[in-house]
A protein has these predicted regions:
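Pyridoxal 5′-phosphate
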Residues: 1-367
């Protein structure tokens, strides 16, 4: 049987065995609802709050209650964008984002437009960079939120979040960042980034699918999107997924403990992969290869070929890659990220994403 090689870690990483072990007691032996007052419920509450405190400390949060557990990156992005905009609608109805955001942010922004908000999508340059001056020019007196990703999920290009946040805060506008791809890969601490809200997801770092969190700085108003009980301090109704919270905290601890060594290893593998491909296939280009980017991500443009055909051929040969966000991979639309970078249509259509992870080896890259 042909060996299969997984090169789509930006879409999702396998559950780490150590994380599974941390979740096992909760899955099999802890029946309590964290909102119940009996002994089982109190025990569940202790475990939930320990996970919250641990994750908050890893993020550099001032208080553990700034961490809201959710079902993943999409819910975190929706809660941040819609929650802040609607909570601050009495102060204005203008939101700023970028043209290269994850579909979760773009869809939430589109929903705001239907509700009467104005949304400005900032442009990026040909390498995927965002100039803070663009943000400065876009801010208006009625701007109530800036939502800009930390690292692009397709190209890996990193935005200069501290500089962008400083521009927004000078105008007293809160900042949300989608750090789903960057958390655990590069340094991500809210005091250093200067953001007020931050989204992260467990299944990108070896945690369970369906786990995630939204950091919300104390004092930031947030209109809940799920209504019902008073869980998560009335910011997200519904019985907390204790196993997911425990797994997310465990995955985050492992990812941060191993981050520096793993980033150096993956960066070397990525550079080797790009060099080998360009040696073997003339004309292959790296999209967004100039600016600082995530160590595990490579977006490659192949001349004279359609990405869909290439992905099928690679899959048949045993290589799992993608054309972009897994949320959109079933669609045949060209990448909105590469189009926003102003790349020629034929280059956009011939581009694929290769993303490495904890189990990727030098042997696999050489294959």
């Amino acid at each position: 049987m042909r060996r299969r090689i997984y090169l789509d870690y930006n879409a999702g990483a396998p559950l780490d065995g150590r994380v599974h072990a941390a979740m096992d007691p909760v899955l099999g032996e802890k029946p309590g609802n964290a909102s119940s007052i009996h002994a089982f419920g109190r025990e569940a509450r202790v475990l939930l709050e320990e996970a919250r405190a641990h994750l908050g400390a890893l993020l550099g949060a001032a208080d553990k209650d700034e961490v809201v557990f959710v079902s993943g990156g999409t819910e975190a992005d929706n809660l941040a964008v819609l929650g802040v905009a609607l909570a601050r609608a009495d102060q204005g109805r203008h939101v700023i984002t970028s043209a290269v955001e994850h579909p979760a942010v773009l869809a939430a922004s589109a929903a705001l437009e239907k509700a009467g908000f104005t949304v400005t999508a900032l442009r990026v340059d040909g390498e995927g960079r965002l100039d803070p001056a663009e943000l400065r020019r876009a801010i208006r007196p009625d701007t109530v939120l800036v939502s800009l990703m930390h690292a692009n999920n397709e190209t890996g290009v990193l935005f200069d979040l501290p500089a962008l946040a400083a521009v927004a805060h000078a105008a007293r506008v809160p900042v949300h960042t989608d750090a789903v791809q960057s958390f655990g890969k590069v340094p991500v601490r809210v005091p250093d980034l200067g953001v007020d809200l931050l989204s992260l997801s467990g299944h990108k770092i070896g945690g369970p699918a369906g786990s995630g969190a939204l950091y919300v700085r104390s004092g930031v108003r947030l209109a809940p999107r799920l209504l019902g009980g008073s869980q998560e301090r009335e910011r997200r109704a519904g019985t907390e997924n204790l196993a997911a919270a425990v797994g997310l905290a465990a995955a985050a601890e492992l990812a941060l403990a191993e981050r520096e060594a793993e980033a150096a290893r993956l960066c070397a593998l990525r550079d080797t992969l790009e060099a080998r491909v360009q040696e073997r296939i003339p004309g292959v280009a790296v999209n967004g290869g100039g600016p600082p980017r995530l160590p595990q991500t490579s977006n490659l443009a192949f001349p004279g070929v359609e990405a869909e055909e290439l992905l099928v051929a690679l899959d048949l040969a045993g290589f799992a890659c993608s054309a972009g966000a897994a949320c959109s991979s079933g669609a045949l639309e060209p990448s909105h990220v590469l189009r926003a970078m102003g790349l020629p249509p034929e280059r956009v259509r011939g581009s694929i994403r290769v993303s490495l992870g904890r189990a990727t080896t030098a042997e696999e890259v050489d294959a």
